[in-house]
């Protein structure tokens, strides 16, 4: 660039070219040679240089750069000037796009200068600027009208409406009845026990046992059990096509009383003729003995039957393969029965007997009897439709809301947090089997709830309606209306002078649910024509068509009857789906209502704000349109439309100048001047001077000016931060955190969903599930154990009394001898009984504690006696004569002689030799007897026949041997002599 001066003869047009080519037509100020006038551009630049010297550079540049800046300014002021003539005709400008032109009408701005290379002062000014470190900057060309927009007119806002028809009422919910039909039944049978016992020499064992149950005949039930409270001891039963007979205790048939059983379960009663069974054992060993026990048993038990009621089970474990509703009446004959007709019997007007009180029933009943191969069962017959029902009441709902939505009914029950869905058509109770109880129970429950809660506030608006909900729940619903609403309906009728049915008016859905369809016309409705002479052909055709229609209808009806089957309603075991449906409907209703209201409010707010936008666009169209389009645009109002152009993002650097003062000392920029480059890595020749706009928008012109004011303070957004100017001079950067924020947003306050707890509900309780089967196995087990304890205790069965058997045998023996033998037998048995009683008394005494002490004393006494006996035996062995005949001793003889007056010296001459010989013979005989007894004992121990024979022979020899001694005299000679 030359250092000469160019005279300012006027303003010229041109383009300033940088390295990037043609950029934009803009104004360039030329330097002047003379001293700057007031407000001239050079004066402005000098003022900027002074401010630059007075204010420390924010980037911390060294002092050498400041000195260079001063030198450069002096050269500009005092350098030589070269004056050139400036052509009066401006040079033609470089062509630019129409949309980028400054003025759309094509006029030239006289303040713009031709393109030239920047002088050092301009470079210094740019270098002293503040670089934007972050943030996005945009440059917006002025709109020319090639693109125009308009504001949308107001919209029609939607109105909140659920679109449902709500009806309140009372309901009763029914479920499938899985519980069996229960009734009382009597079981009659005779328990036969045949025992076979082996009798050995010293033991008895049970070798076989036969047990069987045989039914009691119906005649015996009539004649003995229910008439006298007794039962026969005889049993007749058929086994293997052979009629067998059994008698209790193998005796003749007798009538035994039925006594209550001591063992009975809470749900059953029993009576029997005996509590024990005995076994007969004869007196002869090495034989088998057979005995029979017959026990007549009557049990009152619980019977159960489940759908389709073709059999029932007893708590004894027996199953009867016949329906409990089978009978001889017309309606009962179609029920199931697997037994022959002769095994079944039905008695009208029967009065059973209570075996405890021995009283007959006052009211007669219809009694059924079935004889099976093992038992006879009786029960009171009842009608099936009266007692059996396939549905049972589950819940009584005192507050239910029904709404119609998308062709279905939704029954909402807040008390159990459940929603049931059904069709809009009513359910016919006739299509399900055994549902006669539903209508009765539903009516009673609904009437009871109405009288307690709603009689004074509501009125019924229809009859009871039945709907089959999903999951197998039958809902009996009766709609209601409040008294106020019903009064409004009545007033409407009076006002309009109408005579409609009040029920149809209060419940408009009733007509839709009656399932009434228009009857289709057919040939059946046309009477059969009678032939006439005028229209014979036509009447013949009608006759044939009528006949075909009758045949087709008959065939269709018969097929429908055979194909029509009643379907049993199956109910799910859980209502979790209904609870989830209730939760979903509750959330859906709340959310939909909330969103609908938000949409309505939003639309209303937008319509109101549209008026504000329409007025604000006249003040600042660029800001309004940019906020509306959510995009940076430049806008200008063209009448009733708005012209817009899109802004381009600046990719290069943006420098902010320190001073906002212009060349005129009285005029300043209202927004900071900047220098920027369009592209990255552009040199100084590609820089453009502009002005900082709002929200980081860069103007390519510096038109925003104002009169300079004192104490001026401004904050401008530059990038992501703010810059602070005071007296039109840059002071510092201000972070956004130091500036307090004022929010212009309106908070949206929404109501949250209310909390709702799900209650655990059981459709079937545990007791109901346990009670669903035919057999109660716990009851069966208890009954079988108690039955075994009652009748089959092995301790009472094998209880053989040998004494009683012997006594019975002796009595039978004497009884066979006639009356004399029977009398003798009575005497003998009485004595034997006394002996047995004595022995039993002794045995009981020994079992007593005092008896043990007595036994101890007896043992001690026996030991003492044994000691004295042992001493006596030893004395006999040592001196048998002295021990056996102590009178033969010498002392006794001397004493006798002394008493008769004799001397001791005469002993030898006067001793009686005959008596001595007799004594010797007696001792010898006693020795032989002792030896004979020993021999006999040895023979008995050895059980040898030879020894026994020898012993008997010895006894005979001793008996036949004559005595060796003479009879003693009655009077002693010595006594006679003494007396003389």
Swiss-Prot record:
The record marks 521-522 as: Cleavage. A proteolytic cleavage by host furin generates two subunits that remain linked by disulfide bonds. Residues 794-847, 823-843 are annotated as: Hydrophobic membrane proximal region. Glycans are attached at residues 165, 275, 380, 423, 497, 514-515, 560, 727, 749. It is found in: Virion membrane; Host cell membrane; Host endosome membrane; Host Golgi apparatus membrane. Its main location: virion. A motif (Golgi targeting) lies at residues 925-928. The chain crosses the membrane at residues 850-870. It is a single-pass type I membrane protein. Residues 87-849 are virion surface. Residues 88-118, 505-535 are annotated as: Disordered. Pfam families: Glycoprot_B_PH1, Glycoprot_B_PH2, Glycoprotein_B. Disulfide bonds join 140-647, 157-603, 231-296, 389-437, 668-708. A motif (Internalization motif) lies at residues 965-968. Residues 96-118, 505-516 have a biased composition (Low complexity). One of its GO terms (cellular component) is host cell Golgi membrane. The keyword Glycoprotein applies. Belongs to the herpesviridae glycoprotein B family. Envelope glycoprotein that forms spikes at the surface of virion envelope. Essential for the initial attachment to heparan sulfate moieties of the host cell surface proteoglycans. Involved in fusion of viral and cellular membranes leading to virus entry into the host cell. Following initial binding to its host receptors, membrane fusion is mediated by the fusion machinery composed at least of gB and the heterodimer gH/gL. May be involved in the fusion between the virion envelope and the outer nuclear membrane during virion egress. This is Envelope glycoprotein B. It comes from Equine herpesvirus 1 (strain V592) (EHV-1). The gene is gB.
């Amino acid at each position: 660039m030359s250092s000469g001066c160019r005279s300012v003869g006027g303003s010229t047009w041109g383009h300033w070219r940088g390295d990037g080519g043609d950029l934009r037509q803009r104004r360039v100020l030329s330097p002047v040679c003379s001293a700057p006038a007031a407000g001239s551009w050079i004066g402005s630049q000098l003022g900027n240089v002074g401010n630059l010297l007075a204010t420390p550079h924010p980037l911390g540049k060294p002092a050498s750069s400041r000195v260079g800046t001063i030198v450069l300014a002096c050269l500009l002021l005092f350098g030589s000037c070269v004056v050139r003539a400036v052509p009066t005709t401006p040079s033609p400008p470089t062509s630019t796009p129409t949309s980028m032109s400054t003025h759309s009408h094509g006029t030239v701005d006289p303040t713009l200068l031709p393109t030239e290379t920047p002088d050092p002062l301009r470079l210094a000014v740019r270098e002293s600027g503040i670089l934007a470190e972050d943030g996005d900057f945009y440059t917006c060309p002025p709109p020319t009208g090639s693109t125009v927009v308009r504001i949308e007119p107001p919209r029609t806002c939607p109105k909140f409406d659920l679109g449902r028809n709500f009806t309140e009422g009372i309901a009763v919910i029914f479920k499938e009845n899985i519980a069996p039909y229960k009734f009382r039944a009597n079981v009659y049978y005779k328990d036969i026990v045949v025992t076979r016992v082996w009798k050995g020499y010293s033991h008895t064992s049970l070798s076989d046992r036969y047990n069987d149950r045989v039914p009691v005949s119906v005649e015996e039930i009539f004649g003995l059990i229910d008439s006298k409270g007794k039962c026969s001891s005889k049993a007749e039963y058929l086994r293997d096509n052979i009629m067998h007979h059994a008698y209790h205790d193998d005796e003749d048939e007798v009538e035994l009383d039925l006594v209550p059983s001591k063992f009975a379960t809470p749900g059953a009663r029993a009576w029997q003729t005996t509590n024990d069974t005995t076994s007969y054992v004869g007196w002869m060993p090495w034989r088998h003995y057979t005995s029979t026990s017959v026990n007549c048993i009557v049990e009152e038990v619980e019977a159960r039957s489940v759908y389709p009621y073709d059999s029932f089970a007893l708590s004894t474990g027996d199953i009867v393969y016949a329906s409990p509703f089978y009978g001889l009446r017309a309606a009962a004959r179609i029920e199931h029965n697997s037994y022959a007709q002769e095994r079944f019997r039905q008695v009208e007007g029967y009065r059973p007997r209570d075996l405890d009180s021995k009283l007959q029933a006052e009211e007669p009943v219809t009694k059924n009897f079935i004889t099976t191969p093992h038992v006879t069962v009786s029960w009171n017959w009842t009608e099936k439709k009266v007692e059996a029902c396939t549905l049972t009441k589950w819940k009584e709902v005192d507050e239910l809301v029904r709404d119609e939505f998308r062709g279905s009914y939704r029954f909402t029950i807040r008390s159990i947090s459940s929603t049931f869905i059904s069709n809009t058509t009513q359910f016919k109770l006739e299509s399900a089997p055994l549902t006669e109880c539903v209508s009765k129970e539903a009516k009673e429950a609904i009437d009871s709830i109405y009288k307690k809660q709603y009689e004074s506030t509501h009125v019924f608006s229809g009859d009871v309606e039945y709907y089959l909900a999903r999951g197998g729940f039958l809902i009996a619903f009766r709609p209601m209306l409040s008294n106020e609403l019903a009064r409004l309906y009545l007033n409407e009728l009076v006002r309009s002078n109408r005579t409609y049915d009040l029920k149809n008016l209060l419940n408009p859905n009733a007509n839709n649910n009656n399932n009434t369809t228009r009857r289709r016309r057919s040939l059946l409705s046309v009477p059969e024509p009678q032939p006439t002479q005028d229209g014979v052909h036509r009447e013949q055709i009608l006759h044939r068509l009528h006949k075909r229609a009758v045949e087709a209808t008959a065939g269709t009806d018969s097929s429908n009857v055979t194909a029509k089957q009643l379907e049993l309603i199956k109910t799910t075991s859980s209502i979790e789906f209904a609870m989830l449906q209730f939760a979903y409907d509750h959330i859906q209703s709340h959310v939909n209502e909330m969103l609908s209201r938000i949409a309505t409010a939003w639309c209303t707010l937008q319509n109101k704000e549209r008026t504000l936008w329409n007025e604000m666009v006249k003040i600042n169209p660029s800001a309004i349109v940019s906020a509306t389009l959510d995009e940076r645009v430049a806008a200008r109002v063209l009448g009733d439309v708005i012209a817009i152009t899109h802004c381009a993002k600046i990719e290069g650097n943006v420098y902010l100048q320190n001073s906002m003062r212009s060349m005129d000392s009285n005029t300043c920029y209202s927004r900071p001047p900047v220098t920027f480059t369009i592209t990255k890595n552009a040199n100084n020749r590609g820089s453009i001077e502009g002005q900082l706009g709002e929200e980081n928008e860069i103007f390519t012109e510096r038109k925003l000016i104002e009169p300079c004011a004192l104490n001026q303070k401004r904050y401008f957004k530059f990038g992501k931060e703010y810059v602070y100017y005071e007296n039109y001079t840059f002071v510092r950067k201000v972070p956004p955190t130091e500036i307090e924020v004022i929010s212009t947003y309106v908070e949206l306050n929404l109501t949250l969903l209310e909390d709702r707890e799900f209650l655990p509900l059981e459709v079937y309780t545990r007791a109901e599930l346990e009670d669903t089967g035919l057999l109660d196995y716990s009851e069966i087990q208890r009954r079988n154990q108690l039955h075994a304890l009652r009748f089959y205790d092995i301790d009472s069965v094998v209880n053989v009394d040998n004494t009683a058997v012997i006594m019975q045998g002796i009595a039978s023996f004497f009884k066979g001898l006639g009356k004399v033998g029977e009398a003798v037998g009575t005497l003998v048995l009485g004595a034997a009984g006394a002996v047995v009683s004595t022995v039993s008394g002794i045995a009981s005494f020994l079992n007593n504690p005092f008896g043990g002490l007595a036994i101890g004393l007896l043992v001690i006494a026996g030991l003492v006696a044994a000691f004295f006996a042992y001493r006596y035996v030893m004395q006999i062995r040592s001196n048998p004569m002295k021990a056996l005949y102590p009178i033969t001793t010498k002392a006794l003889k001397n004493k006798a002689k002394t008493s008769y007056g004799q001397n001791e010296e005469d002993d030898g001459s006067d001793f009686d030799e005959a008596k001595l010989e007799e004594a010797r013979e007696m001792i010898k005989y006693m020795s032989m007897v002792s030896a004979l007894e020993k021999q006999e004992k040895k023979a008995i121990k050895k059980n040898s026949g030879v020894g026994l024979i020898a012993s008997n022979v010895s006894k005979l020899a001793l008996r036949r041997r004559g005595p060796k001694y003479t009879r003693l005299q009655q009077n002693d000679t010595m006594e006679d002599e003494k007396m003389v």
